[in-house]
């Protein structure tokens, strides 16, 4: 059905309201360094970092349905590149080099894995992370005779947080554009059926490698931004495989059907991991395994899928029981009306906005 002028007006108003709300939210988050304690700021750094990692991971894996465990490889490349070059280059120059190294590595890996899918792609990603970690350990022991690098730079926690927040905004914007573009539609078709995507004229190798590079660049930059937070970085810390598994679990817990889905996995898991690592450090891995089992058996579509199914069930009209007549039938009909989508504050703002900006036909 063709979109009417009223639909266009409402969609435009919703877009304006959404942009205004997101601007206020980002502004409030940007003020966190001046409002929170050192511990609170440290927690926010961890959470925003995982937001970047999870959304960047979902750009590739959420569309192509190829589960990547190479997150720790690119995250570690970004972190260790800064650690190696910080003594001979300015900080932002090390960020640029880390970005270039991450993109080049993603290009090589993307080309090598064009014909790999399923569990073989998962194993390759995990093996890549371990291979880079072992090569870095070998290099440090045999060439530099050390097992780590010191990172001393005037880049405090507030600056790290602000840069990560800006990176999170950018990766969300890229995801928003991707979901509304022909390229993003092609990626979704590749995830559904790669053979069909090729038959309709989509350049499958180019699309997969391109989105893999984009995802890897954001992951690498997040690792580079996190490097100044720690005074000493060693290969086992930088290329920790736990990062890859945590990101996957966060993404699946939140759900990949919506762009904001990963947030529903990042926020609760970051809070719980902070508590567990502080109070019960040896139970954290067991907890992650339990969460993954719950997702597989009970939440295959994540929290977003659960919310959508629940709302659909509430919106479905109830069937009329047999035997109800007269007033009882009328009462049941009122109770069984479908629940309409609440408009809330956004709806009130939209109505006010419509009064301020009337339809073109109403202008004099």
Regions found by a protein language model. Give the residues of each.
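Transmembrane alpha-helices and adjacent helix-loop boundaries
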Residues: 1-364
């Amino acid at each position: 059905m063709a979109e009417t002028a009223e639909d266009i007006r409402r969609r435009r108003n919703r877009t304006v309201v959404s942009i205004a709300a997101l601007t206020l939210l980002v502004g409030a988050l940007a003020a966190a360094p001046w409002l929170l304690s050192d511990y609170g700021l440290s927690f926010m750094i961890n959470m925003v970092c995982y937001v970047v990692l999870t959304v960047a991971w979902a750009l590739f894996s959420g569309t192509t349905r190829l589960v990547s465990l190479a997150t720790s490889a690119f995250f570690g490349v970004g972190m260790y590149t800064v650690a190696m070059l910080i003594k001979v280059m300015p900080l932002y120059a090390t960020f640029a080099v880390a970005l270039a190294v991450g993109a080049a590595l993603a290009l090589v890996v993307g080309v090598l894995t064009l014909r790999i899918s399923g569990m073989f792609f998962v194993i390759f990603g995990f093996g890549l992370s371990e291979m880079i970690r072992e090569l870095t350990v070998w290099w440090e022991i045999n060439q530099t005779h050390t097992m780590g690098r010191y990172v001393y730079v005037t880049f405090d926690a507030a600056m790290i947080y602000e840069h990560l927040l800006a990176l999170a905004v950018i990766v969300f914007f890229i995801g928003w554009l991707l979901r509304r573009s022909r390229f993003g539609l092609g990626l979704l078709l590749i995830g559904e059926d790669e053979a069909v995507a090729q038959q309709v004229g989509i350049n499958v190798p180019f699309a997969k490698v391109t989105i893999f590079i984009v995802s890897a660049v954001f992951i690498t930059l997040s690792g580079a931004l996190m490097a100044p937070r720690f005074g000493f970085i060693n290969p086992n810390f930088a290329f920790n495989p736990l990062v890859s598994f945590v990101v996957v679990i966060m993404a699946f817990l939140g759900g990949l059907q919506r762009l904001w889905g990963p947030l529903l996995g990042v926020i609760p898991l970051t809070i719980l991991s902070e508590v567990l690592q502080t109070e019960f450090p040896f139970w954290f891995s067991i907890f992650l395994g339990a969460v993954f089992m719950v997702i597989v058996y009970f939440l295959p579509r994540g929290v977003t899928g659960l919310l959508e199914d629940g709302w659909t069930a509430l919106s479905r009209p109830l069937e009329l029981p047999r035997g109800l007549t007269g007033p009882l039938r009328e009462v049941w009909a009122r109770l069984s009306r479908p629940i309409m989508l609440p408009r809330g504050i956004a709806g009130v703002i939209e109505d006010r906005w419509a009064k301020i900006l009337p339809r073109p036909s109403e202008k004099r």
